[in-house]
């Protein structure tokens, strides 16, 4: 019989630049859409593999970095919210009626956020 020690696994450290990375929302913009900057969010995703592989090969596996682009809605409560589409209630004033194609990303998996000009 082989005994496997129980307890906490070895910690895996992933550097996360998100701790102090926030992008401000321009609440004073005349057109509502201009309040929400266009951004690219780089984040780490979960990866699974059902194939047979060696332990060493599995230990060398890396998390994939994904990129989501859209308008930054908010960064509160450990969550970054993005939307890709919107409909205008009034085109002249730029008032937004509804948003769509929304993505909610936990800040703990975000590596970087870049503002798109």
Model feature map: region roles:
Residues 1-10:
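Short, positively charged low-complexity motifs
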Residues 13-117:
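Conserved RNA-binding domains used in RNP assembly and mRNA/RNA metabolism
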């Amino acid at each position: 019989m082989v005994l496997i020690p129980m307890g906490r696994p070895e910690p895996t450290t992933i550097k996360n630049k998100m701790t102090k990375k926030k992008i401000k929302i321009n609440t004073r913009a005349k057109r509502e859409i201009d309040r929400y900057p266009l951004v690219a969010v780089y984040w780490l995703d979960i990866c699974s593999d059902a194939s047979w592989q060696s332990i060493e090969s599995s230990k060398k596996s890396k998390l994939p970095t994904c990129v989501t682009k859209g308008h930054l809605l908010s960064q509160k409560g450990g969550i970054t919210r993005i939307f890709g589409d919107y409909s205008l209630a009034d085109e002249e004033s730029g008032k937004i009626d509804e948003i769509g194609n929304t993505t909610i990303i936990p800040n703990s998996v975000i590596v970087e956020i870049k503002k798109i000009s």
